[in-house]
């Protein structure tokens, strides 16, 4: 498919990252297939997660098509850009339309980005996952790439005033080894494996993060931070 919008948007995003002076650490990019479909299953801690994960995938030579809620597509500014970059609109009132669209994109060799938690985790821990990532991988016969973003919550997240002037924040994006699920796999077992893998990756990323989590609003209670405790 033609990508006339994605390249200039990426250029603008890179300028924004440069303005913020973000210190990137991209790990495991080699796990993203250079061709063919794949599902990036990404944790969700802030409003910039999609742009950061998309940026981290660029060294693999891939543009990620994100599944995003309809409200973004309805926005007069963001909507045309989202459609121009061939992202996938998720309209909860339209049943399976978004799932079918994502399945079609995967079968045509696209990389799809999905946030299986559904919404931002205000505790910055990984919540229960929905089964969409596993079901898409099973249906299209493609791998799931567990993906962790850490640091984005320090810039802009839910229930906290955004700080786009914050400078030199370390940002980690880690891609894990691919998980494969055939069409006869147990969906619930697959979802459990995916969540356990993402939790393990998150803990490893946090352990190696250069800044201290102690006493920070952007850090989970488990690490001595003062973010809201998980509900479950």
Model-assigned labels for residue ranges:
Residues 13-15, 83-89, 116-120:
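Short, basic, glycine/proline-bearing loop/turn elements
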Residues 1-19, 23-34, 104-107, 152, ...:
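Membrane-interfacial terminal anchoring regions of lipid-handling membrane enzymes
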Residues 124-186, 220-221, 228-229:
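A cross-family acyltransferase "interaction/gating" segment
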Residues 105-133:
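Catalytic-site beta-strand/loop segments enriched in glycine and acidic/polar residues
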Residues 56, 81, 104, 135-139:
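Hydrophobic/aromatic ligand-binding patch that stacks against planar heteroaromatic rings
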Residues 20, 33-94:
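Catalytic core of membrane glycerolipid acyltransferases/transacylases, capturing the structured
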